[in-house]
Every structure is written in C-alpha cells, then in structure tokens.
Amino acid sequence: AARSIPVVPYGAGSGVCGGVLPTTDTVLIDMKMMRQLRHIDRARLTCDADAGMIGQHLEDDLNAAGFTLGHFPSSIYCSTLGGWIAGRSAGQCSGRYGKIEDMVLGMTVVDGTGRVLRAERGGENAALLPLFIGSEGILGVVTDARLRIAPAPPCRRFASYLFPSTETGLDAIRRIFQAGLR
C-alpha cells in the first residue's frame, strides 16, 4: 500500500474484462492453492470454502454430502468462488437459489493495507459485504466465504421449449415464476 503497487488476485482466469491483466509493477496473487471446502454445517445449512475453489469442484463436494450451492454460472467449470464473489455472479438456477450475493453469509477479505477483515451478514462488519461483493477485487482479496447451501434435490431434469414468439415465451416464464415453480 505504501508504494502504491497494484495487487491482483488470480483465480481461474476465466474473466473476460481484462481484470487480471497485470502491468509490469503488479503483484499477481495466484489463488489456486486455496481450494478447500473447509466445513459443512448440516444444521445451519452453511458451508465454509476457500476463494480459490473451482465452482464445479465445490458443487461436486457439496453433492457428495447431499447438498447443493445451487449456483451454476456458465463458467462453473473454469471459475472460482472468489471470482464469483468479485464479479457478483448469477447462474442458471438463480431464480430458485438466488445469486451469489444472496448465498454469501460471510467472508474474509485482505484489504489494500494488508488488514484481514471478517464480514458476517447480520453481524460484525456486515456493511462490508455489499461493498466487496461485485468489487472485482479492487477493494481487497477475498480469501474464503461462508455460504448458504440447500439440500440437493433428489433428481434434476432439464428441458427446453420452443414458443411461437418472444412474448409468449416471456409470458410462460412469468407464469412459471408466479406459480412458484423453479
């Protein structure tokens, strides 16, 4: 911080906005070794995971324990939890489980001065959560997060439908959501 040297966290490198393109005086932090699912709290339906964990690996580990995060961005195979948080990501099942900002209950961040901050929803430093979620890593490096999880569904079925017009397709989506179907 004293030398104004940029620090850029590097998760899986799937971002398309150029956020991980360092200049010659940049410190690049490779997050790949921070890739563990640390804890599942079955009673509270939460899990603690490292920010460098690839999304599909997180989902696979949760599924093996009977749970799901329910977050399925198109980049799930090549993006990290920290990247999802930094990018404020949404996924294909956001209508059912919410976006990443709805799932993050707490996180640890190292800010630009090197301070380690813990923010918990409804607790200490809660006001920091909306600042860091979607900040693209500008304000600090997310190191881990506590996430809301759900019991894994007994089965998943996917289908596609063709509608005669955009309007009828949008009307069908509206009726599905109003009926509470997800």
Model-derived features with residue positions:
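FAD-binding subdomain of flavoenzyme oxidoreductases
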Residues: 36-182
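Glycine-rich N-terminal segment of FAD-binding domains in flavoprotein oxidoreductases
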Residues: 1-34
